[in-house]
Swiss-Prot record:
Localization terms from the record: Cell inner membrane
Native source organism of the sequence: Ehrlichia canis (strain Jake)
Similarity field: Belongs to the PlsY family.
Record protein name field: Glycerol-3-phosphate acyltransferase
Subunit structure: Probably interacts with PlsX.
Purpose: Catalyzes the transfer of an acyl group from acyl-phosphate (acyl-PO(4)) to glycerol-3-phosphate (G3P) to form lysophosphatidic acid (LPA). This enzyme utilizes acyl-phosphate as fatty acyl donor, but not acyl-CoA or acyl-ACP.
Underlying gene: plsY
Keyword Transferase: yes
């Protein structure tokens, strides 16, 4: 296995660390998958503990950040750096430790973006807050912010990076399909 393959595998493994689940046990909440939406991410943890949700958000973001930083230390190939982010997000969504049932990847995507282009995190956050203030849906805020950043990547990066980021974005959106259906039916929980 060459160094590039090793970094992609390591990015997947880093991404697959289920911090929301680990912190929910440490914090005495039990199995977060049996609470609220059943998701292991920060939004679901938020339903039981704001403090643990913040820590979950930070640690899930760090998974993407560390994976991208690792790739950047071994290669100046920007496409490879984006691929490392993709593998970290896939790890978060489909962790080997949890029978491939993980989170939605928003925080890990955000951490990846933070290392690649920190200004995009500011835009993401602004879009997220605006949509959240208007609609009160975390899921809708995440989807619209992800699409917005996808458009920014398309205008600032090459075709290879843009396609890789498109795949990341589509994965995040697909992970939100149930939320989209609930929003349409008027059954999505507001925060």
């Amino acid at each position: 296995m060459n160094i590039y393959t090793s970094i992609l595998v390591l990015s997947y493994l880093i991404g697959s660390i289920p911090f929301g689940l680990i912190l929910s046990y440490i914090g005495g909440l039990g199995d977060i998958r049996k609470i609220g939406s059943g998701n292991i991410g920060a939004t679901n943890v938020f339903r039981k503990s704001k403090k643990l949700a913040v820590v979950t958000l930070i640690l899930d973001s760090l998974k993407g950040f560390v994976s991208v930083m690792l790739a950047k230390n071994f290669s100046s190939d920007q496409t490879f750096v984006f691929m490392s982010a993709l593998f970290s997000i896939i790890g978060h969504m489909f962790p080997v430790w949890l029978s491939f049932k993980g989170g939605k990847g928003v925080a890990t995507l955000l951490g990846s973006i933070m290392f690649i282009e920190y200004k995009f995190v500011i835009y993401f956050t602004i879009f997220w807050i605006i949509v959240f203030v208007i609609f009160r849906y975390s899921s809708l805020s995440s989807i619209i912010s992800t699409i917005s950043i996808m458009l920014l990547v398309y205008t600032h990066y090459s075709a290879n990076e843009s396609i890789t980021f498109l795949v990341m974005s589509l994965l995040v959106i697909v992970q939100h399909i149930e939320n989209i259906v609930r929003i349409i039916k008027g059954k999505e929980n507001k925060i």
